[in-house]
Amino acid sequence: MQYGDKTTFKQSLAIQGRVINALLMREIITRYGRQNIGFFWLFVEPLLMTFFIVMMWKFIRADKFSTLNMIAFVMTGYPMAMMWRNASNRAIGSISANLSLLYHRNVRVLDTIFTRVLLEVAGASIAQILFMAILVMIDWIDAPHDVFYMLIAWFLMAMFAFGLGLIICAIAQQFDVFGKIWGTLSFVLLPISGAFFFVHNLPAQAQSIALWFPMIHGTEMFRHGYFGDTVVTYESIGFLVVSDLALLLLGLVMVKNFSKGVEPQ
């Protein structure tokens, strides 16, 4: 193919795949290095954090306060919340860390954001699968009731993480101070993510307010898949899908608008 020739959709897709793969490898090496366990930190990092939380709940004997398996309760809420929180935090620095690469005509601003969010989602997903499998094998938690329903919930929340990451990155690009305080703001959002409560246990008025937050629907859905009919959940798949698509569309528009003013350095 000669320079300047138009590419087919298949060729463009192949080029895009190579760009994302190269950015992923660069991000992994830059963040984790080539020595020791290297890229394995990608999922070891979230796994260790989740392990710490689970052990804390285990040794304070949280099961004394509920008939529900509290380790399973934590595992079906906290890791998912950390996925979208970490993804949005990492998205903020994606452009500044890759400015020099924007000289390449096939590398776009959107690619750098997508790569970082994809890395966080992949790491959180691997850690979640491994840790839940280990906990089931050592009989600390029961096997999930509906794995497929859980996978759908996780996928929809991964979409939420991408959309949120695009929006947060776009805002931080326009207002530098926002990028510095988002880490704190996202931490404050954790209590309303649904990670630490069931909507069913809230007062009726609080339930109606809580169900306006998309991440609560994702958590409720994930827990419904794990616990089955032993718990009462209030997820709306339709609301979560519409919210994800709205965030993605808004995020893409915002990134497109500010990308025009980003100059390689």
UniProtKB/Swiss-Prot annotation:
Its membrane topology, per UniProt? Multi-pass membrane protein
Q: Which UniProt keywords apply?
A: Capsule biogenesis/degradation, Cell inner membrane, Cell membrane, Membrane, Polysaccharide transport, Sugar transport, Transmembrane, Transmembrane helix, Transport
UniProt keyword Acetylation, yes or no: no
Q: Name one GO cellular component term.
A: ATP-binding cassette (ABC) transporter complex
- The record places domain ABC transmembrane type-2 at 37-258
Q: Which residue ranges run through the membrane? A: 37-57, 64-84, 118-138, 151-171, 178-198, 235-255
Quick check: keyword Hydrolase in the entry?
no
Single GO biological process annotation from the record: polysaccharide transport
Give the subcellular location. Answer: Cell inner membrane
Molecular function (GO) terms for this protein are: ABC-type transporter activity
Role this protein plays: May form an ATP-driven capsule polysaccharide export apparatus, in association with the BexA, BexC and BexD proteins.
Q: What is this protein called?
A: Capsule polysaccharide export inner-membrane protein BexB
| Annotated organism of origin | Haemophilus influenzae
Q: Which gene encodes it?
A: bexB
